[in-house]
């Protein structure tokens, strides 16, 4: 917005409507008419419109003046007091005179002013200027002192620049206004709304699977404090079973009187046709089908066995083994005597350290013999002597 826009604004039509309104309402002694009330309302409407136009003109003028002040300050900072732009802009006293455009248009009658009606007396120019200045001071009392000071400053500038040529102001006017310096940054705005949720990310690389190897055991902790002694329990009855357990446990098995051919009647050569004569069930357990004797308690055991054999098919000797978990522990071998009968017995015994769940059995070595399972000549047993010695 520049200075030429001020010259193109229309003059303020304030005095003419006032005089017409006063004549229409008969305030100057005219005879009353029938439509006097309507004329008063019409006058008030025109008066309000005129007042609104006044206010609009004043607002535009104040905006123009502030723009010119900013432009002048920028040019003075950039080029100093003798810059061409400053002298050209301020060479005309009416460019920054806050009252100049208004009083010039109001003081000189223009062709846009409405003609006076017959019987109206025009107000003198001085009274019109004073009337407009009074309105300006009434609505903007703070601008009065600044307007007078600005007018005096423009006049001094005009006198100091009067020696310049006539082409200088015209050239400066054609340049136009320059851009002012950037203002300070404004306060940050409010945060915006949250954006939409983004797509899911790429799954990460799976980690290295851990190992199930147990680490080395840590050092033993310090011993805890000794607890208080417990309460004395009630006196118990004498345990008779303890004395029985301290006694030697015995098992004795006998044949049932049958005759057995090893090749046809025995599976794997193990004798299984036993009858129990005596057995401690807490220490021994017999498996009838397999013929094995299981030990239930660790300890030192005396194992014994005897078998009556009958030689057949020109066999001149017989042999059997006492096995522990199918491993040979004792072995007995007997040959036939010349001129004797084919029956003969073979006895063997020994001491062995056994652990719980170990099994004892009698196994024949040769298959071409027959066994006489008589209860007096064929038997098998074991005696627990005591606990195993400490290693």
Swiss-Prot record:
Main location: membrane
Residue ranges annotated for the Collagen-like domain, each copy included: 180-229
Membrane topology: Single-pass type II membrane protein
One Pfam match: TNF
Basic and acidic residues bias (residue ranges): 1-21
Annotated Pro residues bias: 181-203, 216-228
TM annotation in the entry: 42-62
Subcellular location as annotated: Cell membrane
Keyword line: Cell membrane, Cleavage on pair of basic residues, Collagen, Cytokine, Developmental protein, Differentiation, Disulfide bond, Glycoprotein, Membrane, Secreted, Signal-anchor, Transmembrane, Transmembrane helix
Extracellular side: 63-391
Topological domain spans for side Cytoplasmic: 1-41
Post-translational modification: N-glycosylated. Processing by furin produces a secreted form.
GO MF annotation list: cytokine activity; death receptor agonist activity; death receptor binding; tumor necrosis factor receptor binding
SUPFAM superfamilies tied to this protein: TNF-like
GO CC list: apical part of cell; collagen trimer; endoplasmic reticulum membrane; extracellular space; lipid droplet; plasma membrane
Domain THD residue range list: 249-385
Disulfide-bond pairs as recorded: 332-346
Region (Disordered): 1-28, 72-129, 146-244
Function in brief: Cytokine which is involved in epithelial-mesenchymal signaling during morphogenesis of ectodermal organs. Functions as a ligand activating the DEATH-domain containing receptors EDAR and EDA2R. Isoform TAA binds only to the receptor EDAR, while isoform TA-A2 binds exclusively to the receptor EDA2R. May also play a role in cell adhesion.
Family: Belongs to the tumor necrosis factor family.
Illness the protein is tied to: Defects in Eda are the cause of the tabby phenotype in mice (the equivalent of anhidrotic ectodermal dysplasia in humans). The disease is characterized by sparse hair (atrichosis or hypotrichosis), abnormal or missing teeth and the inability to sweat due to the absence of sweat glands.
Protein name: Ectodysplasin-A
UniProt organism field: Mus musculus
């Amino acid at each position: 917005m520049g200075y030429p826009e001020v010259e193109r604004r229309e003059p303020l039509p304030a005095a003419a409507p006032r005089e017409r309104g006063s004549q229409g309402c008969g305030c100057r002694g005219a005879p009353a008419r029938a439509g006097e009330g309507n004329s008063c309302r019409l006058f008030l409407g025109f008066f309000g419109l005129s007042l609104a136009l006044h206010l609009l003109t004043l607002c535009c003028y104040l905006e123009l003046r502030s723009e010119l002040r900013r432009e002048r300050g920028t040019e003075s900072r950039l080029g100093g007091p003798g810059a061409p732009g400053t002298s050209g802009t301020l060479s005309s006293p009416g460019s920054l005179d806050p009252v100049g455009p208004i009083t010039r248009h109001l003081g000189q009658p223009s062709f846009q002013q409405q003609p006076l009606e017959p019987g109206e007396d025009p107000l003198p120019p001085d009274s019109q200027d004073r009337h407009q200045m009074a309105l300006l001071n009434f609505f903007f009392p703070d601008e009065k002192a600044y307007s007078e000071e600005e007018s005096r400053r423009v006049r001094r500038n005009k006198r100091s620049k009067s020696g310049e040529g006539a082409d200088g102001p015209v050239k400066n006017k054609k340049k136009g206004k320059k851009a002012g310096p950037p203002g300070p940054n404004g306060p940050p705005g409010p945060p915006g709304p949250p954006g939409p949720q983004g797509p899911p990310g790429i799954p990460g690389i799976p980690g290295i699977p851990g190992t199930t190897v147990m680490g080395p055991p840590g050092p033993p902790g310090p011993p805890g404090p000794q607890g208080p002694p417990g309460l004395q329990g009630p006196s118990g009855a004498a345990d008779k079973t303890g004395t029985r357990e301290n006694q030697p446990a015995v098992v004795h098995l006998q044949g049932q009187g049958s005759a057995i051919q090893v090749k046809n009647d025995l599976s794997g050569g193990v004798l299984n046709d036993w009858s129990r004569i005596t057995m401690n069930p807490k220490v021994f357990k017999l498996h009838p089908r397999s013929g094995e004797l299981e030990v239930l308690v660790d300890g030192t055991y005396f194992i014994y066995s005897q078998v009556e054999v009958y030689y057949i098919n020109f066999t001149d000797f017989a042999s059997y083994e006492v096995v522990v978990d199918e491993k040979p522990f004792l072995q007995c071998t007997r040959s036939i005597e010349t001129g004797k009968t084919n029956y003969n017995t073979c006895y063997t015994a020994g001491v062995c350290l056994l652990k719980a769940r170990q099994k004892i059995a009698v196994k024949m070595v040769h298959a071409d013999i027959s066994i006489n399972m008589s209860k007096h000549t064929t038997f098998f047993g074991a005696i627990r002597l005591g606990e195993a010695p400490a290693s």
